[in-house]
Amino acid sequence: MRVKLSMNETYDLRFGESHIEVHKFHAGTILASLLIAVVLQSFLPVYISKAGVLDLPLLITIYFGLSRRNPSTGLLLGTVIGLLQDSLSKTPLGLFGISKTIIGYLASSIGARLDTEHPAARFALTAAFFVLHQGIVILIQKLLLAQPQPWFTMRLLVACLVNATLGVFLYYFLDRLRKS
């Protein structure tokens, strides 16, 4: 017996059926989440200095990438979020655009193959994607902008843990906005 699967389906060898579902959201959920995250990212560090470790647009990119499970959608969402973040920050245009595009694609690709609904899996994936995102940003700054940047700092570790923890709670809230 042969089973043919489309690109976005996973075959479970134990039970003989696909078990990963693609989540749909109410109209405007993605756009509203994106805009709120980008605006908060721009203004929170101005008023609360400790909020500089947060990367809310990255968390939105990861969540919708893992939930929608379509690499093309994740790629485009990461590009839009990254370029919006670049346009509202003091970074060169494209720095976050490139890094969030890669993360959006990878999150969607992994989301299509793994069940990412468990909080521990979400924490681990968010932490890994955060470190990868920061690595891409540092690589771009070193190679393209010739700016010396350290690879690993204590700030990166703290920011990774804070963003992964916040991500688990944020993802729980965003799960409530799914269509049933």
PLM feature spans:
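Terminal, non-globular segments
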Residues: 1-180
